[in-house]
Structure formats: C-alpha cells, structure tokens
C-alpha cells in the first residue's frame, strides 16, 4: 500500500472500526471453535447455580468476584447450564475492547498507533484463552479501557458544567472494575492524580476528585454492607487477599509457581466445591491460632504470617521480587486453570502473537513515548498498577493480563517508529531500534529458562496428564485408558502423590490388587498428612476380605479427616462385623 493509499485508508474511520471489530471477533471465534476444549472450570457457574436453587453458600461468597458472580447468576436464570453463552459474550466484549484500545491509541498517540495496537491485541491469542475461562478478566479489561477513555475525554472538556457528571461516571467505572476484581481499586489513586494535574484550578480539581471518589464508593458500598450484615465483619469486597499474598510471597513461592498449603491440591480433590483452597486457608488460620477467626481476621493472619516469613528471609524476598519483575515481561504464560493451560499450548502452534513480542515492542515504546509522557500518563500508570500488583502478589497470566492492552499501544508506537525510520532511510536508528527489540525478545525467552522449563513440566504433568487426562477418564469410567495418563504424569513428576492415588484406584477397579496396593503405599509415603492414601488402602484391604489390616488404616484416615463420611461408614461396617 502506497503512502497516499495508507493515508486515505486511515481517514476512513468507519471502515477501520468495522475491520477491527470483525477481525477480532473472527479470530476469537476461530479459537473458540477450533482450539479450545469444552468448558471444564465451573467455579462461578457452580456457585451461581447453587444460589439460584436457594442454597446459602456461606463464606464462599467472600471468595468470589461480586459482579461476576451476579453476571453468572443472570446468565443461568436465562440460559440455564448453557455456559457457552457466557464464553461467547466474553469474546464479544474482548472484540469490543479492541475497538476501545484503538480509540485510546488514536487519541493519545495518533490513528496509526491506535490501529496497530488494536491488531496487536486481537492477535494476542492468550488473551482469548483467558476470555474463555469463565473468569472475570474480560470485564476488568473492558472497564479499564472505558475508564481511560472517560478520563481522556474529560481532559478535553474544560467547561465545568459539561463534564461534572463524567467525573462521577469515571468513579462508577472504577467501582465496577473493583467489584469485578478487587485490585482494580488501585485505579482510584491513578484517576485522582490525573484529575489533579489536568485541572486548571484547585477548587475544580477537588470537586472532580470528590465526584470520582463518590462514584467508586457508590458501587463498592453495597458489597461492603452485604458482607457486614451477613458476617458481622468489615470486608470491603472479598476476603482472599491474605491467601493470595501468601501464594505470591510465602515459603515455596518462585514468582511464577505459587506457595500453597502442604498437600493442598490433594485436599481440594476430595471436596465437591470448586476452588476449595479458600476454605482450607481459613481452616488452617483458625487451627493455627486456636480461635474461630472471622474471614477478615483469617486474611490478616495470612498477611502477618507471610510478612513474618519475608522479614526472616529478607534476601530471598528481595530475589523473589526481582524474579517477579522479569517474569512480568517474560514470554511464558503461567496459567492456574487446567483448560487454559492446555488451550495455551495448542495456540502456540498458531500464527498468533506471543506475549514476548508484545513485551519487547512495548518496552521500547515506553521509552520512545517518554517525550509525550504527560499526554500518555494514563497508559504508563495502567501498566505500573498491574506491575505493582504482580510484584505484591504473583505473575500468573491472569494477573498481568490487564496491562497487555496498554502495552499493545506502546508496542504499536514502536512499530510506527520503525516504519518511519525505514521510510526515511535512517538506517542506523532503524538497526539500533530493531536490534533492541530483538535483544529484548530474546530476553523474554531466556531469563530464568531452567525454572520456566521446570514449571512447564509440572504444568504438563498435573494439568494435562493428570487433571484433564487420567482424572477425567477415571470419572468417565474409562479406567484402563486412565492408567497411561496417570503414568505419564508420574514420569514427568515422580513426587506427585495424586497421580499414584489415581493409578491405585484404577488398578483396584480392574482387580489388580497388587499394583493398587503398591501405589496406595506410595501415596502414604509422599503425603502422610492426607487421609486419601490410608483410606484407599484400607478400602482395598476391606475389599480383599482383610478387615484386620483395613481397620488401623481407616482409623488413621479418620484422625486425619474426621469429617469424611466414607471413612465413617466403612469404619462402622468393619467394627460392626468384628462385634458379631
């Protein structure tokens, strides 16, 4: 396309908007139909269905995004269990967000930057993977972009009578983002700084700041009141902040791989509720203190516990933060949802943009746009907010994702700069800029490579071969087919106890008692503090007609997990048989 034709195209705004939206929608629908498995992570749908059926989910409501839970409830009321409707809605919102990023880029750095940024974002395949997980990130990204657009528009309107309501609207959007994902509250100080520096008079600035704050409080306060009325506990939004802080900074955290309670995954598996770790953390806090802590006190306990650990290991804590900083810009995507990780691996074979190229181009763009810092302040601030959030918590893909749309704008800034240098034949600057991008791109792949490979091996073992492989096949009754999947998980991670447990149960159902016993004993060896190994080995002995061997194992399982009804049932059965 010649320069004249490209200029003419850039002037045709309606055509640009249609091309962006439908290109994004087509790419996302192709990923939805061709590269993703059926939805298997149903945390929000599960609780929405429970509430709809009249059940009180108790403290679990404090573990969930308030707005997203109610969106799920609304979808369930209309469409029932057809959760694909919500997935399609989220990729529609993702396509709409590409348009918003175009508008933001256009207003701040020019139409060409906006257009390229929109295409960078729609070709970032991992974004669509996250949009399809039935988690609230799609709505967070949408609210973030709306907030930036509103703030930019308010800057353009100087008449106080025209834009007072817009400051209130900005606060409402911050509130919507916060009741979707609590760390979005960090956007409030960003908005207040923007208001202060852009207003010509202190009096008008203070009025606008009060309106922004009022809009935010208007959305947050109903959730806070709900929490206090229901639990007699002051909880602003959710009660999982201490748990998440422990994940990112506690013993065993690597920056990408989170710290967990001992045998947490194993303990979660025996529960019917999804994402049961929240309950386990509250139980652990109450057990360690010997008091029935309120949910907010449990969160404070884990904050205190983690801070004590960090103070006791200051050098390790510092190194961890350095790692998190580099991981934030790295190419590798850390997924904490099984299906998302599998879909991410599938998309690696597609001709889409990895985060590494967006990161490398974006970092260079951050430098190139410094001369327009005041104008682009909000873009810098949005990236810094989520960098700070990742440093405080951990660098899972979902946690850094809200920075990606704004990083895409800076990436587009680099692309337009490279094009200008090429067109004007500034070879030295072109080579220097391109060389820097290439070096940064290589860095996003090479930093801490061995740790990334270790984590990816763990992800393949636990998520693909265990959760989505052997475990799912076992639940379908395909026991013989499940065995090689469990075995593959063990081959990749020999210390992963749940895979031995799955193998043992599969062999037991297939009447290979010798192999079943061998695997259950390995479970006990690896996870002596969890009841599953003792329970299953006890049940195996009971099945073999050896109640004297089963009894001590079931008693041990009962001591470890007194509330397990299956253990109680079989203990009573064996004891009743012994009394006859």
Regions from the PLM with identified roles:
Residues 84-85, 291, 301-302, 308-379:
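Membrane-interface anchor segments at the N-terminal boundary of transmembrane helices
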Residues 25, 73, 117-118, 165-181, ...:
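Membrane-interface alpha helices of multi-pass inner-membrane proteins
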Residues 39, 63, 67-68, 85-93, ...:
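Multi-pass, polyprenyl lipid-linked donor-dependent membrane glycosyltransferases
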């Amino acid at each position: 396309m010649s320069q004249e034709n490209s200029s003419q195209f850039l002037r045709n705004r309606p055509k640009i908007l249609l091309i962006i939206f439908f290109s994004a929608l087509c790419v996302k629908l192709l990923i939805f139909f061709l590269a993703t498995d059926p939805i298997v992570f149903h945390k929000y749908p599960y609780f929405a269905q429970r509430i709809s059926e009249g059940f009180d989910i108790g403290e679990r409501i404090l573990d969930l995004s308030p707005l997203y839970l109610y969106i799920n409830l609304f979808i369930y009321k209309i469409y029932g269990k057809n959760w694909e409707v919500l997935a399609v809605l989220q990729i529609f919102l993702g396509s709409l967000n590409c348009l918003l990023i175009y508008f933001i880029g256009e207003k701040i750095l020019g139409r060409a930057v906006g257009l390229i940024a929109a295409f960078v974002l729609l070709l970032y395949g991992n974004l669509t993977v996250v949009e399809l997980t039935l988690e609230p990130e799609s709505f967070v990204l949408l609210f973030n972009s709306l907030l930036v657009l509103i703030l930019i528009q308010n800057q353009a309107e100087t008449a106080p009578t025209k834009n007072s309501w817009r400051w209130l609207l900005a606060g409402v959007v911050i509130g919507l983002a916060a009741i979707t994902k609590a760390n979005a509250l960090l956007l409030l100080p960003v908005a207040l700084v923007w208001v202060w520096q852009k207003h010509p008079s202190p009096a008008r600035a203070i009025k606008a700041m009060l309106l922004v704050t009022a809009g935010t409080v208007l959305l947050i306060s109903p959730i806070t009141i709900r929490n206090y009325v229901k639990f007699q506990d002051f909880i602003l939004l959710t009660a999982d902040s201490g748990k998440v802080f422990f994940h990112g900074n506690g013993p065993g955290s690597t920056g990408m791989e989170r710290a967990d309670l001992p045998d947490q995954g194993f303990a979660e598996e025996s529960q019917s509720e999804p994402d049961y770790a929240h309950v386990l953390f509250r139980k652990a806090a109450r057990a360690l203190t010997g008091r029935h802590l309120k949910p907010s006190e449990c969160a404070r306990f884990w904050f205190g516990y983690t801070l004590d650990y960090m103070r006791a290991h200051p050098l390790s804590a510092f190194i961890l933060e350095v790692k998190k900083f580099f991981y934030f810009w790295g190419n590798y995507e850390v997924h904490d949802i099984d299906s998302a990780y599998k879909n991410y691996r599938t998309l690696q074979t597609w001709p889409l943009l990895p985060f590494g190229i967006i990161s490398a181009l974006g970092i260079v763009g951050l430098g190139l746009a410094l001369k327009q810092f005041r104008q682009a302040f909000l873009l810098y601030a949005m990236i810094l907010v989520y960098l700070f959030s990742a440093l405080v918590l951990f660098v899972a893909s979902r946690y850094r994702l809200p920075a990606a749309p704004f990083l895409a704008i800076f990436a587009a800034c680099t692309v337009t700069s490279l094009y200008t240098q090429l067109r004007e034949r500034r070879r030295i600057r072109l080579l220097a800029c391109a060389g820097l991008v290439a070096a940064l791109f290589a860095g996003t792949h090479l930093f801490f490579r061995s740790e990334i490979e270790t984590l990816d091996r763990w992800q393949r073992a636990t998520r693909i071969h265990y959760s989505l492989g052997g475990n799912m096949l076992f639940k379908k009754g395909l026991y013989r087919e499940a065995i090689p999947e469990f075995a593959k998980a063990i081959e990749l991670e020999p210390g992963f106890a749940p895979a031995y447990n799955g193998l043992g149960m599969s062999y037991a159902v297939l009447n290979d008692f010798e192999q079943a016993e061998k695997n259950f004993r390995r479970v006990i060896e690896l996870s002596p503090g969890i009841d599953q190994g003792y329970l299953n080995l006890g049940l195996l002995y009971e099945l073999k007609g050896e109640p004297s061997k089963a009894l001590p194992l079931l008693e041990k399982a009962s001591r470890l997990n007194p509330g397990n009804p299956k253990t109680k049932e079989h203990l009573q059965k064996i004891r009743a048989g012994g009394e006859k």
